[in-house]
């Protein structure tokens, strides 16, 4: 079992937390992580760019001049791609850029990203995090207690509840900070049969230097990925 220190919200060590080796301490597969990030970014592409061909541009139905005896080049329409204000030849059209990735590769990529952060010593486990109000000052005090000023930090929280929502909102005005509530509608601490970790993704883990997990979130990750 891998072991990390367990902290409270004041940045004080209060114990240790065991992490499953098959999730947090595997040999990172960088190829699979790259494939996951490529897959994830492909889902963000709107694919709505569109250009008009010569047949779609308004006008140009009349031949600009007769075919012969003018001394000029032959043209059939002023909307030809070689004309100003003409249509576009071989231009982009709306398309679906999304890619597919097998479930096993998604799991392996998540495990690899978590293991990479563990090997770097950048996983911080907190017994619990919660704010009574969504104020930037609360978050600044928290990151100061841990000595993380100027770091890119990803907070991953397990359940939808007001204290966690306040943590998420408190991150918004501080560059480099992001909070994810890795939950799905209907999931609760008591109802583990439908537990998922929606929102937890490889791109965000790799895009932030520090990964802060609550104790419940560690248990949830091990339940889903185990």
From Swiss-Prot:
The keyword Methyltransferase does not apply. Residues 52-71 are annotated as: Disordered. GO terms for biological process: translation. Keywords: Ribonucleoprotein, Ribosomal protein, RNA-binding, rRNA-binding. One of its GO terms (cellular component) is ribosome. InterPro entries: Ribosomal_uL4 (IPR002136), Ribosomal_uL4-like (IPR013005), Ribosomal_uL4_dom_sf (IPR023574). The keyword Protein transport does not apply. It comes from the Bacteria. GO terms for molecular function: rRNA binding; structural constituent of ribosome. Belongs to the universal ribosomal protein uL4 family. HAMAP family: Ribosomal_uL4_B (MF_01328_B). Part of the 50S ribosomal subunit. One of the primary rRNA binding proteins, this protein initially binds near the 5'-end of the 23S rRNA. It is important during the early stages of 50S assembly. It makes multiple contacts with different domains of the 23S rRNA in the assembled 50S subunit and ribosome. NCBIfam families: rplD_bact (TIGR03953). This is Large ribosomal subunit protein uL4. It comes from Pseudothermotoga lettingae (strain ATCC BAA-301 / DSM 14385 / NBRC 107922 / TMO) (Thermotoga lettingae).
């Amino acid at each position: 079992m891998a072991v990390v220190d367990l902290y409270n919200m004041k940045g004080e060590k209060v114990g240790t937390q065991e992490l499953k080796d098959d999730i947090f301490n595997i040999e990172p597969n960088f190829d699979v992580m790259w494939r996951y990030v490529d897959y994830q970014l492909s889902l963000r592409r709107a694919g709505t760019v569109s250009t008009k061909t010569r047949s779609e541009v308004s006008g140009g139905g009349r031949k600009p001049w007769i075919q012969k005896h003018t001394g000029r080049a032959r043209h059939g329409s002023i909307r030809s791609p070689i004309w100003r204000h003409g249509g576009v030849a071989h231009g982009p059209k709306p398309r679906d850029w999304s890619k597919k990735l097998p479930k096993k590769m998604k799991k392996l990529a998540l495990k690899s990203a978590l293991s990479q952060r563990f090997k770097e010593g950048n996983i911080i486990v907190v017994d619990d995090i919660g704010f009574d109000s969504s104020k930037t000052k609360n978050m600044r005090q928290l990151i100061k207690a841990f000595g993380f000023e100027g770091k890119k930090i990803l907070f991953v929280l397990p359940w939808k509840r007001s204290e966690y929502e306040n943590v998420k909102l408190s991150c918004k005005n501080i560059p480099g900070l992001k909070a994810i509530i890795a939950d799905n509608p209907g999931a609760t601490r008591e109802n583990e049969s439908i537990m998922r970790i929606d929102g937890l993704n490889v791109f965000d883990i790799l895009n932030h230097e520090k990964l802060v997990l609550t104790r419940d979130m560690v248990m949830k990750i091990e339940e889903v990925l185990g």
